[in-house]
UniProtKB/Swiss-Prot annotation:
Catalytic activities: ATP + H2O = ADP + phosphate + H(+)
SUPFAM superfamilies: P-loop containing nucleoside triphosphate hydrolases
Gene Ontology CC: one annotated term: nucleolus
Organism: Saccharomyces cerevisiae (strain ATCC 204508 / S288c) (Baker's yeast)
Residue ranges of domain Helicase C-terminal in the record: 405-605
Protein name: ATP-dependent RNA helicase DBP7
Function: ATP-binding RNA helicase involved in the biogenesis of 60S ribosomal subunits and is required for the normal formation of 25S and 5.8S rRNAs.
Amino acid sequence: MSDEDSMLLNFTTNEDTAGSSYKQAAKVTGGRWKDRRRMKMKLEGKTVSRKRKANTTGDEGIIPGRGENSIKKLHKESSYSSEEQEKYKGRNAHNTQGRTLPADSQFVSSLFTSNREITTAVNTNIHDENVAINPSNAPLKGDQFASLGVSSLLVSHLEQKMRIKKPTSIQKQAIPQIIGNAGKNDFFIHAQTGSGKTLSYLLPIISTILNMDTHVDRTSGAFALVIAPTRELASQIYHVCSTLVSCCHYLVPCLLIGGERKKSEKARLRKGCNFIIGTPGRVLDHLQNTKVIKEQLSQSLRYIVLDEGDKLMELGFDETISEIIKIVHDIPINSEKFPKLPHKLVHMLCSATLTDGVNRLRNVALKDYKLISNGTKKDSDIVTVAPDQLLQRITIVPPKLRLVTLAATLNNITKDFIASGQQSKTLRTIVFVSCSDSVEFHYDAFSGSDGHHKNLTGDSVRLLTKGNTMFPCFSDSRDPDVVIYKLHGSLSQQMRTSTLQHFARDNEATKGKHLIMFCTDVASRGLDLPHVGSVIELDPPFAVEDHLHRVGRTARAGEKGESLLFLLPGEEEKYMDYIQPYHPMGWELLKFDKEILMPAFKDVNVNRNDKFIRKDEKSSKNKDVGDKEYEWDTNATTWHLNIERRVVGDSAFKNLAVKGFISHVRAYATHISQEKKFFNVKFLHLGHLAKSFGLRERPKAMGLQSSKDGNSEKKPTKENSKNKMFRMARMAEKQIASEFNY
């Protein structure tokens, strides 16, 4: 072998390069594509990133309203240079759909843009201020109760204790006819709200009893049965009756309403009573299950009064009323014991409006009746109208601006009250909304914003304290003198009663203060709340009859009053033509921006609630700093953003807002069929309406059903039969092996 044949070549190879080329040449087959991809990445020496790194730049995140479970793909970290990333962001900044945003970012829409155009430019039913107004429900000047046949004892009691000297128009017509009636006719009393219908039937009944020569006490039996649709109205009638009979202590009324202990009511019935006042359900319950009530009625019952008949039918009490009347008619009446009373039952039906339900109830309860009315006759029909001295106002507000416009309205009323200097009087305002959840939201929004409040009666009455910034007119140097109330049917009966009593009371606790009550229609019927200056209908009523009852809480018994109705642009504007016959004195059409928002938010400085404010800056609030003028629209936007930020940061308040919005939309869909052309849920812009509840997106888009807030729990999965069998077997084996099994 030659040297050339035995020559050796020595090459140095890189093991990493060789291994890499081998790995790259390897091909993974079989299995799922995810498994193949993981194996390929492992062969290539790459690690699988299971968790996404936190993004400190805030350029990427989770779309608000979409939970983490909804994100199914994770983007890989960008390998582009910083210049390329900025260029990409700028090119795609206009399109955020389908991309991730910061976790705490939300779309904040402007209050004053993208609103529906208001088409009503001219008021077709102008209120003429130069026309002399005579209050339509005021007491008559030239008449006296004594001339109507009222007992002299009652007349002196009315003048001295109750400060009532003159009868109203409906009282002048009803009292003589009821007193002079010997059981011949029934009566249908029809009169507008605030005209004194309660006294028009209580006074003649009590006068007839007092004019008897026979001795009467609480054991003489019940002379009258009064049925009211709501607990509040029944309680009010009871208190009026108690005040009237306080001049003759031997006459005793009894109240039967739901929410109270039946045992206590039975005890009062056993002691005896002369007037039974209650709600239909509880009265029927006692008639069916309490023996003593039939004994009370059989001795002396002569009068059956159905107050607020339209509401009785609206709430579905028609069958209950029919059952009560049937049971009462089956009770034999002894007419020999009190010969001066009517020889048969006298039925009375009272209503402020004439509806189909009232006509049905009239056919069931009344026979040979007389119609007593002070309504306006038109085309042979009786039309109920609002009181002449009522100043009706209407404003058309876009849905996004409802909340801030309500705040501006309440601010203007409070500011005018403070400027008037009437510290010895009490101003009352009632705000009607459609549902109880909406009441809860608005109550907490206006009373619990910054912690400057104090609970007075449970959690339904709050006094705003010094430092509160809810209204722009508030000053740090004095107390706001504003008390916020809430009232709806979901509250307990004790809380409803105590809230109404506190709102209606005139004492040192309410003297010189502005009392604002957020309520549903539970407070719209029959309640005689003293000195209610303004009524605000934030949500339109479900029927025009409810509108008359709402505005009837003010301008009562000849007093002046104001009412403001909120409407949305579009189809709701035609509602004004629908209610025009009920307002013969016309109304004022207010522009929400120039006549409500601007007076409230100009020349003030509304501060943000997410920044710390120094004392020197805080003291300059509500003062002109040099020649600086604050834009009213900027202040209004800041005020509304404060509410929105509170919704974002406070989960409990957010739940109130979401529930209030959902319940409001559901309630909006329950308008009667005749008014669907004005109030149709299809016409609503739900996104704009959600903003009026402080929500930046509709609740469904905010992941209401997800566990984003950590409050909702996952539903347990259903256990199949096999796992259940094994679990039961393990439990049996454990029980056998237990030391306590002997």
